[in-house]
Amino acid sequence: MRNLVLIAGRPSHPPGQHEFRAGTRLLQRWLASVPGLSVNAYDGGWVPDHGVIEKAHAVVIFADGGRGHPLLEDDRLGDVGSLVRRGGGVGLMHYATELPVDAGAAEVDAWVGGHYEDRFSCNPIWNARFERFPEHPITRGVEPFETTDEWYINVRFAAYSTSHQGTRDVTRFWPILVATPNEKVRAGPYVWPHGPYAHVVAAAGRTEVVMWAVERPDSGRGFGLTGGHFHENWGNPQFRKVVLNALVWVTGVDVPAHGVLSDLELDDLRRDLDEKSTS
């Protein structure tokens, strides 16, 4: 049995946005039927004790990032680093992909292959269309789809190889979700800072990687997902399938041939929401 730990960040943003607890509980429920996988979800930004990480095969964080990133408190970078050194997996979702250059970014680059960098990357809300996918377990059963989300672009990626033959001594990289923002998206305004950034505008026409996966030389795995801002997007079956597949894969469990199956009732999106002010 492989153990996956899902960590939900503390409440933030208006209702329906950054619903970390509700999102991780949905993911936990959908993964319950995957053979060989045990999933534990924790609220409040971290696990209750070191033993949880020590017993995990993978840790995935869905939380606010930047200077308030859960990894930057206490010796959590060290705890996850120990997991990585024994071949464990790491996943970062949405804002959790942002780490300061001087605090945590280098570690995250080594673990998951890249990060959102303040003033280099940007965070527009736009409708991304995903039409083609690489051959990879994470894309099994995933069909073309589109969602409007705060899809970060111009992610800062570490050195990697996309040639997957004879490259076991380097980190291998797969662009799982790619889409092309139009010039209006690049020109902003972004969510914050509003921009625009000249280097982002100058890259007009370029395809952007908004979800990726890596396999490290020690066979440990990682992934990053820049979307996940709007809770309602869990209602999109293709979006949730690609994320569920990533959670299974990063833990070292075989992804089903047609991807992880999930069902959803309308009320499911209303459960476990954080109490937030609407004013």
Predicted regions and their residues:
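Extracellular ligand-binding/catalytic regions of CAZymes and related secreted enzymes
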Residues: 1, 23-26, 33, 185, ...
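Helical hinge/lid and interdomain linker segments adjacent to catalytic or ligand-binding clefts
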Residues: 5-6, 12-100
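Active-site-proximal beta-strand elements of phosphoester/diester hydrolases
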Residues: 7, 176-178, 223-227
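Short, solvent-exposed loop/turn segments at secondary-structure junctions
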Residues: 11-12, 66, 97-99, 180-184, ...
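Short aromatic-enriched loop/helix-cap "lid" or pocket-rim segments at secondary-structure transitions
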Residues: 18-19, 102-106, 187-190
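Catalytic beta-strand/loop cores that center a nucleophilic Ser/Cys/Thr
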Residues: 32, 118, 122-218
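A glycine-rich, often tryptophan-bearing local segment used as a flexible ligand/cofactor-contacting loop or short
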Residues: 66-144
